[in-house]
Each structure stands twice: as C-alpha cells, then as structure tokens.
Amino acid sequence: MSFAGRPPDTRKRASQGIAFFRLGVLAALMVLAPWASVEAAPIEVRFAEGAAHGLLLVGLVSGETVGHGDLLQTAHGDRVESRLILRFKDGSVHDEHVVFSQQRVFTLLSYRLMQRGPSFPETVAVSLDRKTGSYNARSARDGKEQESSGSIELPADVYNGMVVTLVKNLAPGASETVQVVAFTPKPRLIRLEVTPAGAQRVVAADLARQATRYALKPRLGAALRLFATVMGMAPADQECVILTEDVPAFVRCDGPLYVKGPVWRIEQTVAR
C-alpha cells in the first residue's frame, strides 16, 4: 500500500504500537519501553568507511535463497551515505538509507527504513533526522494506516542501521552497548549489547579464514522483559560474523527483520 497522496490534516495517530528495529543491515522490534537514555560513549573510528558496492544473498539458515541485495555506499569527506536494498523473490523490498559522520567517532545523522510486500506483515516507513530533531513512523496493514511524528533528541550513541559498521570497529575481544530507536509507534530507546561470541572458521573459495561471531542482544529491564515475553513482543537476538584478520570485513548476519519474523541470513556473495 502506498502512503502517497494523503492530506496532512487527515493523518491518523496510532493508538497501538508497532516497532521497527534495524540492526545494520537489519531489525525491526516491537517493544514497550520509556524514553529514557543512559547514554554511553560513541564508538571510535578505527577503520573509516569509504565507497563500496556489496552484493548480498538473502536466505534461510537452511540454505534456501529467498532474495538478493545490494549495499551501496559513498563517502564525501567525513560524511558517509549507505543504502541497503534487499529484493525478495516474491517482490517484497527492504530498503534502508543511513547517513553518518566519521570524524573521530561515528555519529548517526539520518535514517530511513521502508518495508513492503508479502514477506512483511505490513508496509512500514520510518525516518529519523538528528539535525532537525524530527521523526516520522507510518504503517499500513489490511487497509488501515497508522502514523506518528514529532520531535526527537538523539543521544550520541544511537546507531540505527549501523551495527555492522560498529562491530567492524570494535577492538579485538571488546564488547559495547549502544542504543537504537524503536517505534511503538512513538520512539523508544532500546539498549543493544554487542559481544564477541567465539571464533568462526569461514571459507572463501578453497581458503579457510578466521572470523569472529558477535551476539547482538537487546537489553530490557526484568519486568519489561517478562511483560514483552508474555505479550509475544520480546526482541530476538541476532548474530553477525566478521572477518577479523588485518582489516575487518562483513561475512553474514542472521536474524529477523521484523517482530516474530523468520530468521533470515544476509551474507556477502560475488559476481560470477
């Protein structure tokens, strides 16, 4: 369903929440949490991002391919624009656009996410902008539309759409806790713990390489975690594998792209 052509004075404010949580490449969560920031230090730049075009496969962990994707990235000075587009065989699309700066530390400047098609339970469009201090979240399902918009002050350690970039910049063996913004439909800050989870042997052609698995765990308070579990809204853990020899490189990430969604594997591939 398209959101176009709707007069501003007829927009509906959502009364029930849906959450959109993106992990670098990747998540949408539905949670109920107060807007309360326990701000941590932003992530330092160890490896600056540059121009890149990555080819991706989208599949199930069983090996079945369900789609393909592109990671398109450009850099202008210390400003980087990164776009992840996943195209599913059934015509569904996951499209997210991140703009960030990398002057000593990584800083999220703006973020947009769009999901549509039969692979997703609803059409979703989300945007955040640090400079204007604004957000907008829209969804459509079964002919019904919901929308929330307003002002938002983003802490320095908010990193929607940048998890893979952050993991590549962690020191060997280091863990970090950052924040992401989820929508219910009003914005809520969620703490995300990123922890190394062991070595992983990967193979490129016939060459074995050493990689590291990272666990990405949303952290809720005990009472909220229990409530979210009972209500079927508990955010799922994710896992990313990063090649950690010399200069880090993305290998794959496993996790759902929406609440209660299937675990999809997004991995690097090559042109043949």
Task: State where each predicted segment sits.
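Bacterial N-terminal signal peptides that target proteins for export
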Residues: 9-25
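Intrinsically disordered, low-complexity regions enriched in polar/acidic and amide residues
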Residues: 7, 15, 145, 175-178, ...
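Sec/Tat signal peptide C-region and signal peptidase I cleavage site
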Residues: 35-40
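Acidic, serine/threonine-rich low-complexity disordered tracts
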Residues: 41-131, 176-272
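Surface-exposed beta-loop interaction hotspot
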Residues: 140-175
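Bacterial N-terminal signal peptides
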Residues: 22-34
